[in-house]
Amino acid sequence: MAAKDVLFGSDARERMLRGVDILANAVKVTLGPKGRNVVIEKSFGAPRTTKDGVSVAKEIELADKFENMGAQMLREVASKTNDVAGDGTTTATVLAQSIVREGMKSVAAGMNPMDLKRGIDKAVAIVMDDIKASSTPVKDSSEVAQVGTISANGASDIGEMIAKAMDKVGKEGVITVEEAKSLETELDVVEGMQFDRGYLSPYFITDADKMQVEMEEPYILLFEKKLTSLQPMLPILEAVVQSSRPLLIIAEDVEGEALATLVVNKLRGGLKIAAVKAPGFGDRRKAMLEDLAILTGGQVISEDLGIKLETVTLDMLGSAKRVNITKDDTTIVDGVGDKAQIEARVTQIRRQSEETTSDYDREKLQERLAKLAGGVAVIKVGGATEIEVKEKKDRVDDALNATRAAVEEGIVPGGGVALLKASAKLAGLEGDNADQTQGIAIVARALQSPIRQIATNSGVEGSIVVGKVMENPSATFGFNAQTEEYGDMLAFGVIDPAKVVRTALQDAASVASLLITTEAAVADAPKEEGAGGGMPDMGGMGGMGGMGGMM
């Protein structure tokens, strides 16, 4: 086992604090509407420019092991906030730095770190309750747009685009962000249920220009096994032909004779038909077929349920207003399923997604939920250069997460005002002893740090801003750094999601408390390099002097 370096007490804390400061100082320049960019070197390709706090934090690795420990613990704050709320990472970093600095001063002055931690926890709990109580639900899409705009650092076009996407697909819908190849940023909305399986044969195509199959009011047969022969299906095919409506077959696979027969019938014009593979694999395929059955008002034809293909009747088939199939995707628009059954299925999937511990499963369940409940919107981020597109995509991701958080838990005044005003709740609050009271004071002071940093980044003296905002009794009065005006933050449209503010404080206090209560730090000792190791002794080459005679 490698030898270790161990530092104790103030030596350990000071070295870790240095790392905390390096990381926090790099991250906090990005805070607020007038925050600056950070340029990050990449081992390949062009450097990356970003204003996203967590992207900066993740890139920082320090040479000194003890400083790096401090920096990594602070990085954990940004990562955790990003995972839970998706935004507010810079705010969380600024809060954590302030709590750590003030806390370490108190420890150096001889106070008990554990009591300081208890005081900090007490204060944080009160502030969290205050933020929850003062948050207001998001009323309309203009507020969604404002939240998005603030998170995208004042880019109103991004805010409006996210609001439009949420209008289209609803709160349950999935909104994804992709890099576009063009200069413009655009919104693409897929209505209905779409899954990534295309037609099994190009002979099914009905629109040769667009290379896709279009079906109006088709019957939909959902079969969970492979179709190798059409013999068992003849009765249902006869019934469909007589109804003169198209038929879409969704099965595990359609192969060999079955596919050939379908294609021949399609080409002869007797049967309007198309076949696609069922989406997903294994158990997930069964679940998605069940979703499709509920959406289209049909039944999954499954041997497990004792239903054979020979006995299928028209009322077991699903139906939809329209189906579009390209070579990669199938989209079912306006399935005729029963609304109450769809609602029940949505509730069931939502419960599964809340209970699952696997992130992958949760993501897949969310996708299924969106396809059933709303739809899918894609924001395609464009720009002149790759660097610009990546930087903009970071901001769109943040804005999207912030708007989701706002819809979930409501909004509070932005610009650091909600935290600053909450600090008034801590005035006069006392702990069980003087050290706990000091812990409460540390949090009260830290709550000023976000608004101070926003002011500093816009070239205004932070303490003057804090003084002016605190003088005004209104809970929504603050400083708009974009225009450098004082007034009602909600009227200015400067709002933050309550969840983001709450998570930032919670995570900052949690990691900062750990740093304050650290009494020893252990790291790998630097390896001793042997002097000039590796090269053989060259003393034997002295004889080369004799080569003079060869010239």
From Swiss-Prot:
Q: Known EC number(s)?
A: 5.6.1.7
User: Is Membrane among this UniProt entry's keywords?
Assistant: no
Chief place of localization: cytoplasm
Query: What PROSITE patterns has UniProt attached to this entry?
Result: CHAPERONINS_CPN60
UniProt keywords (A-Z) are:
ATP-binding, Chaperone, Cytoplasm, Isomerase, Nucleotide-binding
Q: Which Pfam families match?
A: Cpn60_TCP1 (PF00118)
Instruction: Note the Gene3D superfamilies from the entry.
Output: GroEL, GroEL-like equatorial domain, TCP-1-like chaperonin intermediate domain
GO MF annotation, one: isomerase activity
Can you state which reaction this protein catalyses?
Answer: ATP + H2O + a folded polypeptide = ADP + phosphate + an unfolded polypeptide
Q: Name one GO cellular component term.
A: cytoplasm
Query: Which of this chain's residues are annotated to bind ATP?
Result: T30, L31, G32, P33, K51, D87, G88, T89, T90, T91, G415, D496
Q: Which GO terms describe its biological process?
A: protein refolding
| Location within or outside the cell | Cytoplasm
Please indicate if the UniProt record lists ATP-binding as a keyword: yes
Name the coiled-coil region(s): none
This protein's source sits in the domain of life called Bacteria
Q: How does it assemble?
A: Forms a cylinder of 14 subunits composed of two heptameric rings stacked back-to-back. Interacts with the co-chaperonin GroES.
Outline what the protein does.
Together with its co-chaperonin GroES, plays an essential role in assisting protein folding. The GroEL-GroES system forms a nano-cage that allows encapsulation of the non-native substrate proteins and provides a physical environment optimized to promote and accelerate protein folding.
| Entry similarity comment | Belongs to the chaperonin (HSP60) family.
Protein name per Swiss-Prot or TrEMBL: Chaperonin GroEL
